[in-house]
Amino acid sequence: MTMKHMHLSVLAYSTGLHPASWRLPHSYVEEVGDIDFQIKLAKLAEKGKLDAFFLGDGQYISGEETGHISYYFEPLTALAAISRETHSIGLIGTISSSFYEPYLAARMLSSLHQISHGRIGANIVTSQFDLEAQNYSMQALPHLEKRYERADEFINVMKKLWESFTVEAIVNHKNSGIGLNHQYIHPLHYQGKYFQVAGAINIPTPKYGRPRLFQAG
């Protein structure tokens, strides 16, 4: 009989998921905006042998009605710092396909994947509040079906980008002056409904592969 394994991660969310958790006497509300606190949590999760440290995201100030602490580090920036202080735990950051361009997201994730030596994953969301959309030159979020359609294309384009430039292209032959073998670089020339991407990504995908993709919820 094959033994099945459960993968466990920790969602580091402010002082806790309950809106009033920050008011508890033992809460760490004063440290929410301190990257050293986030690093401490990630190290604790790594020590406990958890598989991943997961950062959600929200892109507007919420919680005025409850006083809930709702501000965040931008997750990929925070994970860059956390990756240099941890060694084995997976690191998952949240990216909204409603606001990001796939080329930008793929580059950021590729950079983090190499900085962390292959430990980065991305939680792809479509966002859920109009107040977020209004920070990105929109009046409201598109209908859910359109957001999911865009997200599907977003993910497909990122995957194509990660396949467009791999380490096999790197030659670095000093005598001949050849740095890259362009046979291994494949510009996308992509024309889709939501995205148009002409070239290849300019960060090579390492031999240990692309970032892992997740969808929470």
Where are these regions (language model features)?
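Active-site beta-loop-alpha junctions enriched in small/polar residues
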Residues: Y13, G58, S96-S98, V125-F129
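The substrate-binding groove and active-site-proximal loops of carbohydrate-active enzymes
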Residues: P25-G33, E65-I69, G90-Y100, L141-E145
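Glycine-rich anion/phosphate-binding loops
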Residues: V29-Q38, F99-S111
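Hydrophobic residues within beta-strands of alpha/beta enzymes
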Residues: F53, L91, I120-A122
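Short His-Asn-centered micro-motif
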Residues: G56, T94-I95, Q215-A216
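Glycine-enriched alpha-helix->loop->beta-strand junction motifs that scaffold or abut catalytic
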Residues: E85-S88, S116
